[in-house]
């Protein structure tokens, strides 16, 4: 043993096998230091190399060995301690203790859930206008139920996307299961959904209602009832949800709780005697919310003994698990190994794992009727398109006896853009990234597209301009991909003289002015019913903005002494043209906007093209109203001129509405001074050289192509 310890290579590579002959040392006679630890501190170098940086370090380690042997000789063999075994034991116990809390947590949650009957389940969501405090209230509820540990770092716990934390808004409806011990001493299983507040993500809110029996209608105590508050109330009311009014931010100096309660009674005819007054920031009054939920929200209806009937609510992609499904069980149970059948696709799957969001994924042995949880299959879904939201799953063999649940209404895109990779070599990787995002956001429509200027790409449909912007941010943050996106445009409907209809979402497909059929066709554009809430002193300016946007006023109501609700019928194209930004600017940020589809209206529309040396740039074309042609045409040519480099010949940039040129800019060519070498020659020689240069430029312009870098398109299309 002594010889082995004296070898440098053994010191540098300590033996990890415990010595069976050496028994455990009593605490009173253990060494003051660990031989193994000392050996591990030596450099890990091969025996053929210099293992020590200096002679001093070598002498120091030799002294350590000498002290070790002295201590060992002073002990009897029955008292010797194996030096490596405790190290291994500590290492293994550390790994076990890091895993055991998670396993114990899952087992403890499973036991508590198994003891809760369906009558003590409550599924509810939080709905409100944007920035009224939904995510902050969710954090306080998670702390109150012990789902997460209380602390200052709990901010937007359920907002898991980078774009949500960056912008401070909720984009995806997020779910969480909570176990709450009520005042009667009984456990209740609560399922919470934190929904988005912006109108562009209303499809998320609508899907969330399918898994809930009630909702917290949250209102800011200083802002009062606003546009999305009204819209979300009527959505929840139409779904038959039980509503619990909650007034938030009561700790603010500008809070006016009596005014807000009066608004709730006047606008929604709600009984405000049961309203809960809270401050989600400080936690004041949060403890009264869950008892109100238990008292006012009914338990879900279901039977765990019946065959499985499961609704697909949401889906996302995981690198290791594949397609993960968020499901709501109406009947039956679901566990690992079960075989399920999809009504939408007819495919059969084997369940690989089930679990709940607590708030992160916690595996469970079984999901029961009334619960909301996640599931993924093993083997997984072959195609992302197989995960159809609103699909019903049941046990294999029960598809003939189980009636599928009504699915979701497909959201209709309001805004269309063309998207192209900045580098065509990245097309394949970008296609996979977009497919993964579309799996998680089913309100996006996707079609392949091609542009002569920008190459292969896609035609994407969104619910609004913010929806489009968030999608672009998610693509960059989650997948590291950047794309060129054209200006948002709304669809156009063409009814030919024969009565046939054509919906055009790509301006490149709009008929040319040479097509004789377009002269006798009727054109329609989409309209929306917009609801604007604003303070009374800004009414005049907002009416002017809506009138300039070709809006038609429907009503003007005072729902308090100082707050006004304006209802307008507006073209959807005005929303793309930053109508909301204009309203916010005119009201110092107090205006709020909500809208819903109002169908088609006849309009005078024309295709606006950007021409470079009389050749159309298809990626920039738009279908606009005739009243906007002059303004947009002038903006286009002025902006595009800034980003196109000078050429050896003259470049003419024009905006054309049909056959009519509405604006023009010219980029002068580089000019060579052909007269520099003539000095004092006669005028005829000078004129001859100038005419020769002019003829050469004319030939170059006839055969030359304008080279436009893709960065020019990127800068032109950016706001």
Curated annotation (Swiss-Prot):
Q: What does this protein do?
A: Promotes mitochondrial protein synthesis. May act as a fidelity factor of the translation reaction, by catalyzing a one-codon backward translocation of tRNAs on improperly translocated ribosomes. Binds to mitochondrial ribosomes in a GTP-dependent manner.
Q: Which PANTHER family match?
A: TRANSLATION FACTOR GUF1, MITOCHONDRIAL (PTHR43512:SF7), TRANSLATION FACTOR GUF1-RELATED (PTHR43512)
Q: Which Pfam families match?
A: EFG_C, GTP_EFTU, GTP_EFTU_D2, LepA_C
Protein known as:
Translation factor guf1, mitochondrial
- Family classification: Belongs to the TRAFAC class translation factor GTPase superfamily. Classic translation factor GTPase family. LepA subfamily.
The organelle targeting sequence, given as a residue range: 1-75
What EC number(s) does its UniProt record assign? Answer: 3.6.5.-
Q: Where in the cell is it found?
A: Mitochondrion inner membrane
Q: Which pairs of positions does the record mark as disulfide bonds? A: none
Residues the entry annotates as binding GTP: 128-135, 194-198, 248-251
Biological process terms from the Gene Ontology for this record are:
positive regulation of translation; translation
CDD domains from the entry?
Answer: EF4_II, EF4_III, LepA, lepA_C
